[in-house]
Amino acid sequence: VARTYLLLAWTWLRASAQYPVPLVMMVLGSFVLTGMDVAAIWIVFGHTRSLGGFALAEVMFLYGTAGVSFGLADLLFGNVDRLSQHIRAGTFDAMLIRPASAFVQVATDRFSVQRFGRLAQAAVVLAVALPRLDPPWSRIWMVPVMIVCGVVIFASIFTIGGAMQFLLTDAPEVSNAFTYGGSTLTQYPLTVYGGDLVRAVTFIVPLAFVNWQPALYVLDRDDPFGLPYGLRFAAPAAALVLALAAALAWRAGIRRYRSTGS
């Protein structure tokens, strides 16, 4: 499956590389556009010393980890969000009869290099924030773990959103609230939101495990909401459970799918 994914993605990358100037402009445009979010945070800190009790470097750390996780998930699996377009056009039927995973084909269709810009911008922010925080080496190991778990969580939400489109062809708007909306939510300390929302993204849609709970461990901060200390280490379990749910949802969608006949 991984080999097929890389082959199909490379095919689209080669096609995009035929037009290098537009390609570079799209990547730079994405980099600059997402950079406006960072500018907004800087503006906020121009008027206050903390946001939800967190300093600038800590907020940038949250922003960077959320951005890298979402950027990788969006780059690798964001196209699953376009499943309804394939269903309406009838191209999904063709994918089902090809000797390759339908999921991989949907994920790599029109593999977008533009998304590299978002990922690169978040990586730069994270690279700048980490040295300013200077966390102890005994805690730094959590950073790659939280990024990997964040990728799995966002990819699973993309997949569940795609599976919903087998039943509701207008489901992308719903899934976007949890993918792109979830990305925006996790860029900031959860202390700026209400307690009910925090509990929802901890125990229902586990967005708090993208970076919030692991970050509390890295930053050696108490949980402002008084949740158990063990949740700081629960990101792998949350990612695994959501990934299994996504796999089951996708398989159920495939079984229920009926050709549009187009």
Task: Describe the residue ranges of each PLM region.
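Hydrophobic transmembrane alpha-helices and immediately adjacent juxtamembrane helices
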Residues: V1-S262
